[in-house]
Amino acid sequence: DVRDVQEMTASNVGLRMVQEEAKLKQMPLTQNFIKTLHKTLLREDYSVFVNLPNGVQSSYVIHAGQYKTRPNSVITRYGTRFDYASPEETPILMRDLVDWYNNAEQEGVLSPVELAALFHYRYIRIHPFEDGNGRIARLMVNFILSRHNYPMIVVRSRNKNEYLEALHQTDLELGPIPSDGAYADIKNIRPFLKYFNNLVANEVYNDVLFVSEKNENVWWYDGERIAFRTPNYTKILNAMRTEPTLT
């Protein structure tokens, strides 16, 4: 599918942007960087068509690199509706989020893991864009971790329910008012922080195993260690990974 290939290409470009920006440790985070990252991921504006109950079709435009102009919400896995910040609130909340991050980073009271977790949670409660918020949130987490010389992390699809449950439990502690979540303190996000700490710890552990692996029969894929009976399989798989045209 052409669209899938385009999205993968845009995601790779976005990841490289994050890696390059993270090297500029003396430069403060800006809203412009977040918007540019969003524009890179979405590539262009596009229309979404929805069918209304009376049989009429409506549409609206998703704007790449621009904050939302329509309210957004989600139906949780428990069937309840959860509202994010309004379009009117969003510019102020995002300004405050970026200002808070830059100040907190300078103060150094929070560890890089705490800083990344709290930024992620606050950002998710704002949901500043009409689409792509999850991808931006995860890229920004890796921007913060990489900026502080931590390994990047991946929320794998098989573990997504655990991630959503950690967010949900934190939402229950803070309540449904978006601004309460957008200004959350580290002590208010304990369920998500516990999940995030474990996620980072597992990533570090896997990285150590990967770099110390001496067995030629072992191949690492999607965070999993796969052992083969002979090294020939791993040689073939590594060749296919580096040369995608091989069949």
Regions found by a protein language model. Give the residues of each.
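FIC/Doc superfamily catalytic core
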Residues: 1-131, 135-247
